Amino acid sequence: MATRHQARMAVVSLLYAFDLGNGNIAEHTDEILEEKKIRNKQKDFALTLYEGVMANITPVDEAIVKHLKDWDFERLGAIERATLRLATYEILFGELDSAVVINEAVEITKAFGTEQSPKFINGVLDAISKDK
């Protein structure tokens, strides 16, 4: 059975695909989650997160842009942008403590991002959590 961490990693993958221009990714979420062995309650969790990010993409992106220091949103790597979107959504609209959300995002970034990404992600999300 998949963990919530694995479900979040799958959501980052979905957001990454969306960001790279795969506009019809929503049509393939079930098969992508199945391929990653995200099933049952974790599938419901992943879909809730993905759909929540997509439904709130404008306020999520605005919160990220507001807290980028000397960075242009469009210059962010697609993995970093996807991770920030998921974590920002959870900070703004979720029920988990911000510290838990930030830690999850940092761990996901360690798996997918560059060497500098975890520190960057941590800083942006910390600023967002303090401002919410």
From Swiss-Prot:
Molecular function via GO: RNA binding
Record's GO cellular component terms: cytosol
Record-annotated disulphide pairs: none
GO BP, sorted A to Z: DNA-templated transcription termination; transcription antitermination
Signal peptide as annotated in the record: none
The keyword Nucleotide-binding is annotated on this UniProt entry: no
Keywords per UniProt: RNA-binding, Transcription, Transcription antitermination, Transcription regulation
Protein family membership: Belongs to the NusB family.
Name of the featured protein: Transcription antitermination protein NusB
Originating organism: Sulfurimonas denitrificans (strain ATCC 33889 / DSM 1251)
